[in-house]
């Protein structure tokens, strides 16, 4: 009996310590996210150039728009593909009109800092912010402006709403669009003040051409309208005249609406907005939820957010809308949070969660861009750059952006994961995504083992035309560590890799083709997206002639150009054929 019991214990321990397995199959010809560079957006706090009570900067910038010396080595080379503004400023009454004008020191004071600093002129204002984005190489079309939606003439139910309120809010928002986008030719589309002329006098004669405008920040929060459908109806009532006013100034802009992150079902903000007159009349461009996952709860895990957002992205696509992830970061549910609570969201634990989240988001072909919350204030609760005890630190979650941005190539492609479940009951232990260059000459695979206990054996399939160039593991010594360790690794005899718990495997491949194949491929190569398609299938280049057939080889339609309308095709499998290519796609009505 004792022998049998000992054998049972040995078998049990061997199972507990068994190495888990994960397999990834890649289809480089099937695009998921058309521009995966937009995974690396950030939200920027408009108060970043203001001074604290001791007269020193509380943010990243001096009032003149230069980075403070301590921030230069941390942030001057930081990768930013898209940005959201004014961040936390919107919650404390930031007024863009008071943030423009020269000299900057003569601008009216704004009280935006609470106990962090006195009322003062916002010298690093809207124009200075736009100059910074230009210096970073960003197009104004990749700036996402958050506008206040509360009018100070109304007595709002909550002091948080009242704190955001500004005078004559409808005109205020319309004036901002005119200042940003109207040509300086006397057209003055809003009448009254010629804001384009004022912009020109402030040193920027040409219109910025900002496309993305979001209505509010988190209007679904309990201290604003609340997460009920009645709250959503109130939100829609408030923003409709604002939307009409700003579209009258510039009909080409793209308007996004905030929505509750994890609402599911028919009686939700998601459903209410998607079925609203604003959506039906084409006045809005997309929905913009926020995500603050934590792995400690069953409904707050990254996997839960990815599942919900996958469904939401598909629902948006059915209504002809996009999804933009306004903000995300590791959640900090503790109230009030300790310094350790704040830090771990930015340390290695928060980094693993963030990479897991980004890999999940990269597979949503109707997701346009993602922003991290929040940059600009190193003493804030969420601080990817931290100021503590007189020291500025680039936290691991920000270090990881610097490491991953060059590796996330032009498109994410279809990556099918088969992973053992996590030791905590998560549906997977390892999450993987793959990224290719425009001409398919490069392929990078990023696999994150988000499990805190299990090691995984990892295998990649679908890469027979690629040669491995580099392989490394990114890891740390503990969830609260702030140093990222890079280790060069090699596959085992079977071509498999080992991914330790809470670590990231990066594989870099180059295409293995001869010179003739290389030239031929560059000439003939193109990609199709989204796949599955609903109403339209896009091509990454203009085609002189193409034919669409069903899976029996029967011709369904033909044409030329950079897209094909697919709304009238029945759900199923189809093939797009050109002289040199044949690509499979699905219709998913």
Which residue ranges define each predicted feature?
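Noncatalytic carbohydrate-binding groove/subsite architecture in carbohydrate-active enzymes
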Residues: 180, 191-199, 225-357, 364, ...
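Carbohydrate-binding surface patches
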Residues: 425-465, 502-506
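C-terminal beta-strand-rich structural cap/linker in extracellular carbohydrate-active enzymes
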Residues: 488-512, 574
